[in-house]
UniProtKB/Swiss-Prot annotation:
This is RNA-directed RNA polymerase catalytic subunit. Residues 53-82 are annotated as: Disordered. A motif (Nuclear localization signal) lies at residues 187-195, 203-216. RNA-dependent RNA polymerase which is responsible for replication and transcription of virus RNA segments. The transcription of viral mRNAs occurs by a unique mechanism called cap-snatching. 5' methylated caps of cellular mRNAs are cleaved after 10-13 nucleotides by PA. In turn, these short capped RNAs are used as primers by PB1 for transcription of viral mRNAs. During virus replication, PB1 initiates RNA synthesis and copy vRNA into complementary RNA (cRNA) which in turn serves as a template for the production of more vRNAs. The gene is PB1. One of its GO terms (biological process) is symbiont-mediated suppression of host mRNA transcription via inhibition of RNA polymerase II activity. PROSITE patterns: RDRP_SSRNA_NEG_SEG. Its EC number is 2.7.7.48. Residues 249-256 are annotated as: Promoter-binding site. Influenza RNA polymerase is composed of three subunits: PB1, PB2 and PA. Interacts (via N-terminus) with PA (via C-terminus). Interacts (via C-terminus) with PB2 (via N-terminus); this interaction is essential for transcription initiation.
Length: 758
């Protein structure tokens, strides 16, 4: 029968239907081609917002730089980046006054972090700008390449493995007159294959040394590479995001550690917590404002939107904030933290891949790299691109755009939140000194503002005062996109509040379904997602049961593992039918082996192997989970794995699921074609690097109280640890005397090899 969809909504309160309007089903839009245009947009817009600032020239790189700080006060509602330093410092002082000891304690915590953080922090993260090759690489590889170049230039402080020592090398590298780097290049030649006697193209990878002058090196060290942000829903236009190189990353990490420590102590901050914890924090602020308003006051909430948050922020303001926050701290600590904002004040934006041209008549395609845009004839470009290039040309140095104002997406989320909260903090009556007062929530660029006042005029005055105060620190609340409502109904970071948070279930839709890792992980992740949504997102029992049935169906179609007694023919059905017939206890077969589904909403927390273990035939158990079976994954069995799930909004979330190693937890092999390209050496480096890190983790698991600090190399640290562990094991009788002697012998051999290697 046909169902009229409007009937579905008859008994549903309007706020619960909000999620159906979200663009979250189906595939998200991806960008194709080059991000160069989007990057030029960002650079040009950022300069436009600060155009009344002062121009200077960087003495080292020759880059023209625009400084809008303490610029003219805005006279209209247009977005602008003219933050006033004294206003920012005053906001910081009031924030500290309302939270005694806030900055002091956070500095102490961060100092400990700075001294203990190891370099492997920088191997996290995916694509990173690799300044040695001038393109993006996985983080671990980019770090390895940087260290290799540092070492060949006599910078070796990083060998201690401490991040702070690596940063000392970075500082020293910037004073060097020149840096020698190794670049990779490809040679192609045609040779005859001995076996087939056909001509084939043989590629050889060459490495060549290249010297960078101080100027060129500094430009690369200060460069952010840009890409297009993918999979953004609900937007017509794509936008550019940036990835910084290894020189900047470590410094940013420490600044964010300090800011995170501050945010954790601020009740108005939506970072760094998430999920239910965040909702609880928000609900508290709302409750406070509503209880205080009671009968005498009105309470209104603005669901806020800021215009181009990043492009109006300024690194110089962050420098002022850090200078104030750390004012009573040791000199070395203040210096380490002030470097990130200084580097960002001098940053350069790499314009991405450039443009692709094709001539229909001659069937020719050619790539114009971004570096050529400075002096190419503009007649080849269309009107809008021509305008962009003309605007950006004065800013280009060695093919890279100088971008002093603005912050680029996601670099200082925590610190910019501190700035936002400091303005919310000024809403207390003791600061407004009038009848209206405000409070609110801030999470990076998203905010909700709650204003209380005796009458509507007071509310209006309060919002106006907030708006103007924000302008003084370079925050531009958008009057077009923000809206105001009686307190009790608002939206903040995609959480919808209506006398309590409404579950926005559509946000979770993209994470339902089969992940495509392997049969074992996919089953586990699928049921965990359903379980988590029953806990956190009002997924009711009937809907959950339906979701489960749909998931199992989807899973069977993905892996072609329909039940052994089904009529559906797939390329696996012959084997699965055979297995079905041979099996005595058919209920014990896993779904991926053609077995029945035993999951229901009551047992989603049990891994499938555990659920069916007692029902399995003995020989099936033996094949499925036998570590000697070559098809059982040989990764160590950790009871919990992490999967990356894609919610519809915000970054990919890490989700824990139970992992049982069976013949179904295979790991797909890398695509072979990479092994024949210039990436091959890089791939091998990456694997070696990964192996070394894993080995180190084995010696110093995170559970051991502290990682070694101040020992001269990873190798020495591991050898000394091995000796200590061996002695403990020997004295407690866990290992025999011969084994103990052998371990000591191996340790000495390793040390000897290490000495020869030096």
């Amino acid at each position: 029968m046909d169902v009229n969809p409007t009937l579905l909504f008859l008994k549903v309160p309007a706020q619960n239907a909000i999620s159906t309007t979200f663009p979250y089903t189906g595939d998200p839009p991806y960008s194709h081609g080059t991000g160069t245009g989007y990057t030029m947009d960002t650079v040009n817009r950022t300069h436009q917002y600060s155009e009344k600032g002062r121009w200077t020239t960087n003495t080292e790189t020759g880059a023209p730089q625009l400084n809008p700080i303490d610029g003219p006060l805005p006279e209209d509602n247009e977005p602008s980046g003219y933050a006033q330093t004294d206003c920012v410092l005053e906001a910081m002082a009031f924030l500290e006054e309302s939270h005694p000891g806030l900055f002091e304690n956070s500095c102490l915590e961060t100092m400990e972090v700075v001294q203990q953080t190891r370099m492997d922090k920088l191997t996290q993260g995916r694509q990173t700008y690799d300044w040695t090759l001038n393109r993006n690489q996985p983080a671990a590889t980019a770090l390895a390449n940087t260290i290799e170049v540092f070492r060949s230039n006599g910078l070796t402080a990083n060998e201690s493995g401490r991040l702070i020592d690596f940063l000392k090398d970075v500082m020293e590298s910037m004073d060097k007159e020149e840096m020698e780097i190794t670049t990779h290049f490809q040679r192609k030649r045609r040779v005859r294959d001995n076996m087939t006697k056909k001509m084939v193209t043989q590629r050889t990878i060459g490495k060549k040394k290249q010297r960078l002058t101080k100027k060129s090196y500094l430009i690369r060290a200060l460069t952010l590479n840009t890409m297009t942000k993918d999979a953004e829903r609900g937007k017509l236009k794509r936008r550019a995001i940036a990835t910084p190189g290894m020189q900047i990353r470590g410094f940013v990490h420490f600044v964010e550690a300090l800011a995170r420590s501050i945010c954790e102590k601020l009740e108005q901050s939506g970072l760094p917590v998430g999920g239910n914890e965040k909702k609880a924090k928000l609900a508290n602020v709302v409750r406070k404002m509503m209880t205080n308003s009671q009968d005498t006051e009105l309470s209104f909430t603005v669901t806020g939107d800021n215009t181009k948050w990043n492009e109006n922020q300024n690194p110089r303001i962050f420098l002022a904030m850090i200078t104030y926050i750390t004012r009573n701290q040791p000199e070395w600590f203040r210096n380490v933290l002030s470097i990130a904002p200084i580097m960002f004040s001098n940053k350069m934006a790499r314009l991405g891949k450039g443009y692709m041209f094709e001539s229909k008549s001659m069937k020719l395609r050619t790539q114009i790299p971004a570096e050529m845009l400075a002096n190419i004839d503009l007649k080849y470009f269309n009107e809008s691109t021509r305008k962009k290039i003309e605007k950006i040309r004065p800013l280009l140095v060695e093919g890279t755009a100088s971008l002093s104002p603005g912050m680029m997406m996601g670099m200082f989320n925590m610190l910019s939140t501190v700035l936002g909260v400091s303005i919310l903090n000024l809403g207390q009556k003791r600061y407004t000194k009038t009848t209206y007062w405000w409070d609110g929530l801030q999470s990076s660029d998203d905010f909700a503002l709650i204003v209380n006042a005796p009458n509507h005029e007071g509310i209006q005055a309060g919002v106006d005062r907030f708006y103007r105060t924000c302008k003084l620190v370079g925050i531009n609340m958008s009057k077009k996109k923000s809206y105001i409502n009686r307190t009790g109904t608002f939206e903040f970071t995609s959480f919808f509040y209506r006398y309590g948070f409404v579950a926005n279930f559509s946000m979770e839709l993209p994470s339902f379904g089969v992940s495509g890792i392997n049969e074992s992980a996919d089953m586990s992740i699928g049921v965990t997602v359903i379980k988590n949504n029953m806990i956190n997102n009002d997924l009711g029992p009937a809907t959950a049961q339906m979701a489960l049935q749909l998931f199992i169906k989807d899973y069977r179609y993905t892996y072609r593992c329909h039940r052994g007694d089904t009529q559906i023919q797939t390329r696996r059905s012959f084997e699965l039918k055979k297995l079905w017939e041979q099996t005595r206890s058919k209920a014990g077969l896993l779904v991926s082996d053609g077995g029945p589904n035993l999951y229901n909403i009551r047992n989603l927390h049990i891994p499938e192997v555990g659920l069916k273990w007692e029902l399995m035939d003995e020989d099936y158990q033996g094949r499925l989970c036998n570590p000697l079976n070559p098809f059982v994954s040989h990764k160590e069995v950790e009871s919990v794995n992490n999967a990356v799930v894609m919610p519809a909004h915000g970054p990919a979330k890490s989700m824990e699921y139970d992992a049982v190693a069976t013949t179904h937890s295979w790991i797909p092999k890398r695509n072979r074609s990479i092994l024949n390209t210039s990436q091959r050496g890089i791939l091998e480096d990456e694997q070696m690097y990964q192996k070394c890190c894993t080995l180190f983790e084995k010696f110093f698991p995170s559970s051991s109280y502290r990682r070694p600090v101040g020992i001269s190399s990873m190798m020495e640290a591991m050898v000394s640890r091995a000796r200590i562990d061996a002695r403990i094991d020997f004295e407690s009788g866990r290992i025999k005397k011969e084994e103990f002697a052998e371990i000591l012998k191996i340790c000495s051999t390793i040390e000897e090899l290490g000495r020869q290697g030096k």
